[in-house]
Amino acid sequence: MDTGKEKDRLDTENPSLIAGNTKQQATSQSSESKTKLAVEKDTDPPLPSRPTTRSATGRSKAAPDTVLSIRHASKNVLQSKPTTAVSLQDINSQTFQEGSNDIYSLLGARSGNEEAIKSKCSLSRPGSGKESDAADSASIKSVIPGEGTPVEVGSIFGDFTGAGQPQPLWDTKRKQVNIFDRSEPGLEDDDLSLDFESEFDCVEDIAADDNGDKILEEWRQKRKHYFILSAAGKPIYTRHGDDGLISPYIAIIQTIISFHQESSNPLKSFSAGRTKIVILSQGPLHLVAISRLLESDSQLRNQLDALYMQILSTLTLPALQHIFAVRPSTDLRRPLQGTESLLSSLADSFTKGSPSTLVSALECLKLRKSYRQQINSILLKSRVEPLLYGLVVAGGRLVSVIRPKKHSLHPGDLQLIFNMIFEADGVKAGGGESWIPICLPGFNSRGYLYMYVSFLDLHDHLPEDDKDINKDDAVAIILISADKESFFVLREMRDSVVQELEKSNSKNIIRAAIEKGRPATTDIVPGTVLRHFLYKSKSNVQFTMSSYSPDFTTLVARRRLLSTYHGLHSSVHSKNTHVKVQHCASRFMNSLAWVTPNFELYCVASPNSNRNALSQSANKIAQWVQQEDERVFIIGGAVF
């Protein structure tokens, strides 16, 4: 056989030898101590001989000296060009609306002649010359071919700066690894239209005049359903429809659940086209959510858990367990009679989009620190012995809270309280007072507390007929006690608090803060491309956000915004990803999620906005919240 052809064939069979000798050539050229040939001549030294042996199978093998040379070279240099290959955890599969799948890297596609990743490219702590390798784990990893362990290049963002001079959180001027070389595929848009407002209309009962087909079609058009049934298959609650309409579907759901209950891995969720069905089993109850909106399994499960807590707030856990232990086929609708409006208002808030439920945090009314401390002092000064918790709440936003030193309120419990007072009918606003026994499952699911609720009349100038003000403008004083005989004592405390609020002008301060509303994005960052943002402080379990006006004032626009946040939240909190930032584009808006150990930031801009402008605005929003944290958050609160 011709010697040249044999040489080409051997090169084809063992290409690693070519790479090894090429690297060996580069090494010998750069090292004066190992060879003088590269110094004396301008041309590259000739390739060394390639001794080979033939194996029993006919394949060529490198001589031992050559193999050792290749292994030695691999310890000092990369075996290929600089790479930004990522682990499988950084690869996502995006399903488009037309049904096709696209596997894409969260780091984006890279050009072949991109510069190698150097140590100076890794993002260091703002204001520090050292790389940040502690608080924030890396999201970009460089993998050396042939090595099993990925090598961390550095954090995407520096550590969140603490007290002191505000520093850039996201240094957009430094040379960084660009994770946005390729835009993420857009999140699927909700199938929303102007008829979304009819989502909350009641479905008529099926009558005897054979209107079943029409009612059934109307029921099927609903984008979201909630069912609660007992383990025996008895219907307890449904958001839409009566017993005659939902009974066949309850039977189907019960059959599916029972079929999987015998296995060690019971059914939790499944999908049918764009419809997602999530099941939450809690003791003797099954809670089911059926949704065609853009929500993940975990988000729907959190909503079902809130509905379950609403039931416990009425019955307590021991009472619920006792009812079904005595009679498993009990119809629970009788003990829950009168609470359907609470369940429905809570369910509707999820369908409209609830930022509080999404991020599992509370929103506070923006006030100066000195004003809030003044209100705290009034509550502490007026405190009576039976008081456990004292709160001032404006339209679902916390103004002030006093609590025992070793106790704090669960966000889910406060959500139940706010839903009962501000969302559901029955608690009169405009100066009325109520005495409500309530179980707070996050505090103690086995007993009742007693809640005194009284609304402040901020609009003394209004006529008596106009006292029913908007729920967003209502201010409530909520006093909670474990003593069921403390109504009159708490009423006296309320009178004292109101008197002091008027004397110190705090009442007018609260009214002015409500009328001012949430800040617009342009008030914070003039000329910004942002239309809305949602910021959660993890340490305070609180969030703040910008005004819905002017872009998200309608019900459809607000739901579309929250659906975008749901998609971002699901993406960055997925079990199989360590992504700290996510950028998505859709036909309605560009969106960005940014997650650090200290905060979560979600923001949206117009679909034609620039990505760099979006990221720079997000950085400025984070800096603004850091500067205003004692105004937008209640840090610690008042304790006794």
Curated annotation (Swiss-Prot):
Biased composition (Basic and acidic residues): 1-12, 33-44
Keyword line: Autophagy, Endosome, Membrane, Protein transport, Transport, Vacuole
GO biological process: autophagy; protein targeting to vacuole; vesicle-mediated transport
Domain of life assignment: Eukaryota
UniProt-annotated location(s): Endosome, Multivesicular body membrane; Prevacuolar compartment membrane; Vacuole membrane
Function: In complex with CCZ1, is required for multiple vacuole delivery pathways including the cytoplasm to vacuole transport (Cvt), autophagy, pexophagy and endocytosis. The MON1-CCZ1 complex acts at the fusion of vesicles with the vacuole, through its regulation of the SNARE complex during the coordinated priming and docking stages of fusion, and particularly at the stage of tethering/docking.
Stated name of the protein: Vacuolar fusion protein MON1
Native organism: Coccidioides immitis (strain RS) (Valley fever fungus)
